A protein has these predicted regions:
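Conserved core of the PLP fold type I
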Residues: 59-223, 228, 234-252, 256, ...
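N-terminal "arm"/small-domain region of PLP-dependent enzymes with the aminotransferase-like
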Residues: 1-92, 375-379
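Short catalytic/ligand-binding loop motif for oxyanion handling, primarily in non-cytosolic enzymes
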Residues: 42-47, 202-205, 235-236, 265-267, ...
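Conserved glycine-rich beta-strand-loop-beta hairpin in the small C-terminal domain of fold type I
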Residues: 111, 319-334, 345-359, 369
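Short hydrophobic/aromatic beta-strand micro-patches
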Residues: 275, 357-359, 400-402
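Conserved core segment of the aminotransferase class I/II
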Residues: 251-324
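PLP-dependent enzyme catalytic core of the Aspartate aminotransferase-like
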Residues: 375, 388-428
Length: 428
């Protein structure tokens, strides 16, 4: 694949930072190396010397003085080497990407540690999207991604979704406006990127079936699309075996996958990682060199100590426990919806994630949720927040069941039912 066509002019103009290059060299050099190159502060001036963390299972991890010095100092942009190695092994263990170990392939998989998954999404889109570009995006969609895309001035084409995720038939219908050969024409407005949340969708809680993933990937091959697989809820699928990722079927180097540790370990550590074609990861690294330089060293070291203590099997066991936790919350949420909202709303049961997507029997939910619900001490997110046109009326609301207890969910939906009845009698 020719990846140059996917980059915008800003990304193509980026050059490696000499200081960042030297940092990577110094980090991998033997102790005999005398470096007067980097502007590193002296670790002897840092007030933090060591730290010990107690995990919920009672075990502890200790970051001693030597490791703490590494955590608090500048480190290579791609990520702390030990964490990169562990994550690479995880991707091989879970997804077995066809191009992970094919170093000579132009689309060989590389990995970048980011400040959470959204940081990776932003860097990818800001490297590839120009004002003239057309981007395919499933609707409804994650507001964080919409917030990145809209200021870039590109044309957004919504792809419909249902309880089985993005509809590949609708995607195919959209793409019939172009011929596959148009991807070779720089002046064509043929889409070059496709964004999707394949599991536990935010806001819907729905997931793509394996059959749909295969069809979407084949359409991407036919029309030379890059797929942005935003998958923070992969491990929170409520059925097993988990549906294989798009990365696991990528033989061309056209899938850029975004993973997150926020949903499984900590949202406050702000760590995620991107797996994708090396030329794209390299461009994202250049962007990172010029901004934050690298993800938090202390967060990376802390996370690595936890992961190494677990091993891959321990990590999977932890993921399964977290999934069971949210499955129970989902069951409570659906039960409360059935109890209070039957006849007032419609929904399909989530296949994963943290959200229930409700279609209320009212013309629009915005004022009802943002004003009236607040007055009744209950909060949801109105559906327009997840739409490309956020000014258009929407009958939907998103309910998050991740934090509330069963009793709180029951009371929340009781209040929502009262709001719906009031809205039906006196529309906002």
């Amino acid at each position: 694949m020719n990846y140059t066509r996917f980059f915008n002019s800003v990304s193509l103009a980026r050059k490696p930072s000499p200081i960042r290059v030297l940092t990577a060299i110094a980090h991998s050099s033997p102790p005999s190396m005398i470096s007067m190159a980097g502007g590193n502060p002296n670790v002897k001036t840092f007030p933090i010397q060591s730290a010990t963390f107690t995990l919920r299972n009672g075990t502890t991890i200790h970051i001693g003085e030597e490791l703490m010095q590494q955590a608090l100092q500048y480190s290579p942009t791609p990520g702390f080497p030990g964490l990169l190695e562990w994550v690479r092994g995880l991707q091989d263990h879970i997804h077995t990407p066809p191009l992970l170990n094919k170093k000579d392939h132009p689309g060989a998989v590389d990995i970048l540690i980011t400040h959470g998954s959204q940081d990776g999404i932003a860097r990818a889109l800001e490297a590839m999207v120009s004002q003239k570009d057309t981007v395919l995006i499933e609707t409804p969609s994650y507001p964080g991604t919409l917030a990145i895309l809209k200021p870039l001035g590109c044309r957004l084409l919504p792809v419909q979704s249902d309880k089985h995720g993005m509809d590949p038939d609708h995607l195919q219908h959209i793409l019939t406006k172009w011929k596959p050969s148009h991807a070779m024409d720089p002046s064509s407005d043929i889409p070059k990127l496709l964004y999707c949340i394949p599991n536990g969708g935010n806001p819907t809680g729905y997931g793509l079936t394996a059959e749909r993933k295969k069809k979407i990937y084949q359409l991407a091959r036919e029309y030379n699309l890059l797929i942005l697989e935003d998958d923070p809820y992969y491990y929170l699928q409520f059925s097993k075996p988990r549906i294989p990722s798009l990365l696991s079927m990528d033989e061309d180097g056209r899938v850029i996958r975004f993973d997150s540790f926020s949903k499984l370990i900590s949202s406050g550590l702000r760590l995620g990682f991107v797996s994708g074609p090396k030329p794209i990861i390299e461009r994202m690294q250049l962007h990172m060199q010029a901004t934050v330089m690298h993800a938090s060293g202390l967060s990376q070291i802390t996370l690595l100590q936890i992961l190494q203590g677990w091993g891959y099997e321990g990590f999977k066991q932890h993921a399964d426990k977290v999934t069971e936790f949210y499955r129970e919350r989902k069951n409570h949420c659906v039960a409360a919806a059935k109890k209070h909202l039957t006849g007032l709303a419609e929904w399909s049961e989530p296949s994963g994630g943290m959200f229930l997507w409700l279609k209320l029997k009212v013309p629009d939910t915005f004022k009802m949720i943002t004003v009236k619900a607040h007055e009744k001490d209950v909060l949801f997110v109105p559906g327009n927040a997840f739409m490309l046109d956020d000014q258009a009326p929407s009958q939907y609301v998103r309910a998050a069941y991740s934090v509330c207890t069963a009793e709180q969910m029951d009371l929340a939906f009781e209040r929502l039912a009262s709001l719906i009845r009031e809205e039906q009698l006196n529309p906002s």
